[in-house]
Design a protein with these regions (language model features):
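FIC/Doc superfamily catalytic core
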Residues: 1-388
Length: 388
């Protein structure tokens, strides 16, 4: 399929020099997509993988336990793409009001990502549409406090931004002028609402992600919010009952190719190459998520079996174990509140779990000690390793 530039350039003057800013054509692509057999087959496979992922809730004993960790893993990965150095353990320690091992602003960025997703899903559940208003509200949550809090959170940019380089004149890409942002985002909102015509949900998510990245409507947080919108849109369109598809690890692993594909769409209209990549990302990510869920179930069952052999101590230790599935890094004080067991008994249970190799203490103090469920963290940490 031969297409030309998917938009047009306008000359802008900013930071004392002229530059060419790109204004994209509205969606859907024109001419229409070329659904070659290979691409159609890849998208069909992606839809099947998405269906298997959505069925996780039928075999997970408690989907909320899986989501708690999975959402936080995504927050770490999505923020890592933007340069933060927070690990999953750092985030969980931060949520316990403990000192993480990296700069506080890094962990706060990751924590804000979790909060922004939670906020968006809550608004959708209340019947609020996926709209420019909701996108801006989520952006306000994403940039609350920490780095980026001075970058007009919750508001479309009023000044020019650019991607790569030190100024627009040597940038890799210059998004639309600030005066055109509302117009471009308004057209994207129409597309999200199936105007001028309906678009299947997975295809809509793939196309909208590129368009959002191209418009780059905010001064900061565009990448994180653009990845968040994929999951949010699939939930709104009822493709997923729970927010379980996160593509950041795949995008991170193929980062250079990802950026090349975005530019390929803008410069030559090669939407098909992007869609092939996006479908592969969905297949790989959804399959990995199902495998991760099964590993977590197997781990919990194996540990329960070992705890059951403790004899009289088994009943209370199983209650503590159940609570630890919910919070794999937690303090003994929280376990007392969660289980309703006395502090002395909780501490005995923790000693049993340490002896079994289920837990590892992260502190060396007498009160409100902090423990890590090592097996869960080993499973969830795969792919989140910080660069050495």
């Amino acid at each position: 399929m031969k297409r030309d530039l998917q938009g047009h350039y306008v000359t802008i003057s900013t930071v004392g020099e002229a530059a060419q800013a790109f204004v994209p054509e509205p969606l859907p692509p024109n001419p229409s997509l070329d659904w070659m057999p290979d691409l159609r087959s890849k998208f069909d496979q992606a839809l099947l993988a998405l269906g298997r992922l959505d069925s996780i809730s039928t075999f997970l004993p408690d989907i909320s336990l899986f989501l708690y960790m999975y959402v936080r893993k995504e927050a770490v990965l999505s923020s890592m793409i933007e340069g933060t150095q927070s690990s999953l353990s750092d985030l969980l320690l931060f949520e316990l009001d403990m000192e993480p091992g990296v700069p506080l602003d890094d962990v706060r960025e990751v924590s804000n990502y979790v909060a922004a997703l939670d906020y968006g899903l809550k608004r959708l559940a209340e019947g609020f549409p996926l709209s420019l208003r909701l996108i801006k509200e989520m952006h306000g949550v994403l940039l609350y406090k920490g780095r980026g809090s001075n970058q007009t959170p919750g508001e479309f940019r009023r000044t020019q931004n650019w991607i790569g380089g030190t100024r627009p004149g040597n940038a890799a890409f210059v998004p639309p002028p600030a005066a055109r942002v509302l117009e471009c985002m308004g057209k994207l909102e129409l597309f999200l609402h199936d105007q001028p015509q309906p678009t299947p949900a997975l295809l809509k998510a793939a196309l909208a992600h590129v368009q959002f990245e191209t418009i780059h409507p905010f001064l900061d947080g565009n990448g994180r919010l653009g990845r968040l919108l994929i999951t949010l849109l699939l939930c709104e369109q009822k493709m997923l009952r729970e927010p379980m598809l996160y593509l950041s690890l795949y995008f991170k692993s193929h980062r250079q190719y990802y950026y090349e594909l975005l530019n390929g769409v803008r410069l030559s209209g090669n939407w098909e190459a992007w869609l092939d990549f996006f479908a592969e990302a969905v297949i790989v990510t959804a399959t990995q998520a199902v495998d991760t869920a099964r590993q977590l179930i197997d781990l919990a069952n194996e540990d329960r079996d070992r705890i059951s052999d403790l004899g009289r101590a088994a009943a209370s230790t199983l209650r503590v174990h159940r609570a630890l599935l919910e919070r794999p890094i937690t303090a003994s004080g929280w376990l007392v509140k969660k289980t309703g067991i006395t502090p002395a008994t909780v501490n005995k249970c923790l000693r049993h779990l340490e002896r079994l190799g289920v837990l590892r203490e992260l502190t060396s103090r007498r009160r409100n000690r902090v423990f890590s469920y090592t097996g869960i963290l080993e499973i969830m940490n795969r792919g989140t390793e910080l660069p050495g």
